[in-house]
Structures are given as structure tokens and as C-alpha cells.
Amino acid sequence: MEKITVTLGERSYPITIASGLFHQPETFLPLKKGQQVMIVTNVTLAPLYLDKVTNTLEQQGVLVDSVILPDGEQYKSLTVMNDVFTALLEKNHNRDTTLLALGGGVIGDLTGFAAASYQRGVRFIQVPTTLLSQVDSSVGGKTAVNHPLGKNMIGAFYQPASVVIDLDCLATLPPRELSSGLAEVIKYGIILDKDFFIWLENNIDKLIALEPKAMAYCIRRCCELKAQVVAADEKETSGLRALLNLGHTYGHAIEAHMGYGVWLHGEAVAAGMVMAAKTAQDLGQFTQAETQRVIQLLKKANLPVNGPDEMQPEDYLPHMMRDKKVSAGKLHLVLPKGIGQSELRADISREQVYKAITSCINAN
């Protein structure tokens, strides 16, 4: 069992990583006998995990209710979040309740925002079941729902009480979802850790095959890196946490334009990271060889390295200008400056953005 702490003073919390955690009551601390919990999950995951988690909690005397939501990015909305509030109110959950997010990034983000909002804030626990949510979205307290005009535009910074990562969940993950998660894994190597990027180049086949030791190390390293960044810049005020958004400004444009769920989040981020690499290459801070290493690693992870055929370069910018990093009308982009290093830049022209996007339309 691995334990990592996200250090935020009185709001610090543990990340627990191991197999078989759903059968261990102590996994779900700080839940205690007599306390209420509302498990939020979706129709795909409920048959797989809901009974296991419910039984483990009920054996400890926890009072368990659940709400089962539809599955998909298109349901990460205020309308669906209202179903969570309805369930909480109908079951008379009060301020000492705990929401338990049992699912991937959509469930985690939506449940976290519901927890931040219900009766002005209740406790919640992240139980991520996808690789993407285990290595990224479950850690750090970013919670949100989507709006038709932009991804994650309505939300709050709200930290969980704990994060529980059961490695056994990956055995039921569809290959496309696994690859989507690997995009966020590769991101960490590009922006923060050259040695980890090299390790990924040498071990990507093991990750695709779900080799247990490789996967455990991979998830632990990603969580360590994310925890360090969140501890130093929780609310993205210094620019450090913004580095975690490599590829996301381009990627969110793809998701919004194509319709949420058509491209998985990691797929859109993968194409976006290539666009960011091409932009950095054009600026002379990333070599062609480094760009090719990124492209080849993404391809080995079965990820796209081009934007959608249906999108033209001019389709991206309106969505990109709604990005949360836009300030004073200027687009702020996270760009690599060598494998393992990155920076946030506000001096990128529209022409340079268009050039990078154009080079990623059926080009690689």
C-alpha cells in the first residue's frame, strides 16, 4: 500500500493506492459508525462496484444511500448535478453527510462541486475508477460542471477529505479509456519530470498491458507530482499549477466544438499537447526531435496526434479565448521548453497558434 499526503495545512488529506481497497473498511476513513454517506456513481460502474463499497461501509455501521447518474461527459452538467441534490434532500442528508464519488473524472468533478455547494459545503471522498481520474482529476480539489459554451466553466476549488485509488478498477477499464488516462500520465513527464518521461518511453507497453508493478509506480509518481504542485499553488495563483494544463487549452476547444464525449478528454489533450509542442518548436524552445518523441510516445499509447478532421484552425480560437487562463483579453498558453520543463506564456500571437494547429491537421 502506498500513501501520499497532499499538504494543505488543516485541509491536508491522504491518497491511498493499493489493490483490494474496496474490501477494507479503514480505506474510507474518516467515515464512522452512524454517519450518513451518499455514494454518487453512474450506470456503468454501479453493477461493478456499488454493492462492494456499500457492503464494506454498512459493515462499519455507516448509513449508506446512493444515486446513479447517466454515464458520459455530456452529463457533466448543472441539470444532472441537480439530481444529486434531489437525492440528498429526499433522503434527509444534512451538513455532516459525506458524498463519495465512485467513478471517473465526470463523477468526481460533479460530485465535488455538489459537495462544495450542498448546504454551503459538506465533506466528500474521491474514489476514482479510471486511470485519468486516478492520476489527475481526483487530486487537487478542482471541481466543476460543463456549460455548452465551455468545459469546466462552473465550479469551485474544494478539496476532498481523502482519495482512495483501488488498482483493481483498472481491470474493467476499456482500452480507449486507458489510453485517455495515459495522455495525462505523459503530460507529467513533459512538463515536470524528464526521467519519468524516459521511463514512460521504456515502459509504455507494460502500462497498456496493465502490468501491476509498472502501473502502481506510474500512478504513484503522477500523484506525487500532482500533490507537490497543488501544495505549492492550490488555487493556480502563482502560475505553477497552470502548467498542469499543457494541451488543455487546445483540447478543451476540441471537446466543446465536437460535443462533449465525442472525443474523450485524454484524446483531446493528446492532440492539444502536440499543438503545444509545435508552438514551442516554432518559438525555438522545443526541438523537432523532442516534438517527435512526444508524438511517438502518444502514438504508442494509442492516442491521436492530430485534431479532428471536422475542425478547421479558425474553429479553435473562439473556444480557446474562453479558457480560464485568458487575462486582459490575452491567451495564456502552457508550452514545453525541453522535455521535463514548461512555462506559461502570454505573448503568443494568433498567427503562431493557427500555424501550430494547421500543422496538426492530418500531418503526423
UniProtKB/Swiss-Prot annotation:
GO molecular function, one term: nucleotide binding
Known pathway: Metabolic intermediate biosynthesis; chorismate biosynthesis; chorismate from D-erythrose 4-phosphate and phosphoenolpyruvate: step 2/7
Binding note for cofactor: Binds 1 divalent metal cation per subunit. Can use either Co(2+) or Zn(2+).
Cofactor(s) needed: Co(2+); Zn(2+); NAD(+)
UniProt entry keywords in alphabetical sequence: Amino-acid biosynthesis, Aromatic amino acid biosynthesis, Cobalt, Cytoplasm, Lyase, Metal-binding, NAD, Nucleotide-binding, Zinc
Enzyme Commission number(s): 4.2.3.4
GO biological process, one term: amino acid biosynthetic process
Protein's job: Catalyzes the conversion of 3-deoxy-D-arabino-heptulosonate 7-phosphate (DAHP) to dehydroquinate (DHQ).
Stated name of the protein: 3-dehydroquinate synthase
Organism of provenance: Proteus mirabilis (strain HI4320)
